[in-house]
Every structure is written in structure tokens, then in C-alpha cells.
């Protein structure tokens, strides 16, 4: 998942509306405590990446990670529907830009592991957090990374023919 984190962070650095930098944070990885920022520390629009577990692929060999990717921005007036709609539209475009870029043939040639990115059945939902004045989009999708194997032949010592409870 570290490679995916670095990849999405690099897209946040390259995107014209984001320009993520250390001194101007527009990205955080939810599964890393050092990336936890307070809303006052974030620069908007903001990209959040995280994962909430995995499923084992049909062949029983690999993990298919459930990934959450979100783009959010802050609005100054939560009562202004026009401002909220513009914020949601802006975040939707940025999220779409990231997904389209990661699915492009050019990116898949440079980063062969992106072949495991599966957007079929991906669910996107608008975010409306009125309490924090944050609006945007979140999408949940899957990715199967070739090096995330479930089986590991070196994990076990030589098999013992006896059960532990037998003398």
C-alpha cells in the first residue's frame, strides 16, 4: 500500500489545483498516524487516501485491498447552495482527474502494478459535512497488488507429523 500512497501523493503534487507540498499539505494517508492533520493545517482542496481491509482473490493467492479516495474542500458559507455545489463539482473533477490519470495507458506502462486497479463496481458518494464545512467526493474501489500475497511458503517450519497433544 506504500507504493499506492506515494503514487497518489505524487499526483496530488502534480495536479494544478492541488500542488501538494510539505509546507502546503493537500494530501494525507489515513492509515499513517504521522499524516494525520487537523482541518486547520490542511490546504484545500484536500486529498485523503486510506484502506479498510482486503478480500482474498478467487485463486486464494492475493489480497484485493478496499481503498478509499476522497477529495474535499472547505466552503465559507454552508448556507450558500451555489458555493457548496461549486465545491462539490470542483472536487468531483479533481477526483476524476486522478482516476483517469491512474487508468491511462501511459501511467500503466510506467507503473505496471496499476493493472491491479479495479474501478468496476466502484462506488462514489458526495460528501456534505456541514459541521466542518467540508464538501467533496469519496470513492471506494479495489486494487490487487502483485506483491501482496496471502500465501508464503517460508512461513512455516518443517511440518511435524505429531499433533502437539500427542507424546
Task: Please describe what each predicted stretch is.
Residues 1, 16, 20, 40-47, ...:
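Acidic-leaning, charged glycine-interspersed low-complexity segments
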Residues 1-60, 153-167:
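Small/polar-rich, solvent-exposed N-terminal microdomains that initiate assembly or binding
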Residues 2-9, 60-64, 72-100:
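Extracellular/virion structural assembly segments
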Residues 50, 69-71, 89-94, 161-166:
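Short, surface-exposed linear patches
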Residues 61-77, 132-147:
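Oligomerization/assembly interface segments of phage tail-like spikes and tubes
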Residues 65, 87-89, 155-161:
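Generic alpha-helical propensity signal that fires on short helical segments
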Amino acid at each position: 500500500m506504500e507504493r499506492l500512497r506515494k503514487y497518489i501523493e505524487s499526483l496530488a503534487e502534480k495536479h494544478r489545483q492541488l500542488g501538494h507540498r510539505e509546507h502546503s499539505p493537500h494530501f494525507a494517508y489515513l492509515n499513517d498516524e504521522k499524516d494525520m492533520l487537523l482541518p486547520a493545517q490542511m490546504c484545500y482542496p484536500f486529498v485523503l487516501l486510506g484502506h479498510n481491509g482486503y478480500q482474498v482473490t478467487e485463486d486464494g493467492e492475493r489480497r484485493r485491498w478496499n481503498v478509499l479516495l476522497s477529495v474535499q474542500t472547505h466552503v465559507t458559507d454552508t448556507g450558500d447552495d451555489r458555493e457548496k455545489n461549486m465545491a462539490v463539482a470542483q472536487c468531483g473533477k479533481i477526483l476524476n482527474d486522478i482516476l483517469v490519470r491512474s487508468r491511462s495507458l501511459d501511467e500503466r506502462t510506467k507503473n505496471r502494478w496499476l493493472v491491479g486497479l479495479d474501478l468496476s463496481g466502484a462506488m462514489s458518494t458526495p460528501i456534505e459535512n456541514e459541521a466542518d464545512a467540508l464538501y467533496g467526493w469519496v470513492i471506494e474501489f479495489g486494487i490487487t497488488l502483485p506483491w501482496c500475497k496471502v500465501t508464503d511458503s517460508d512461513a512455516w517450519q518443517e511440518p511435524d507429523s505429531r499433533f502437539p497433544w500427542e507424546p
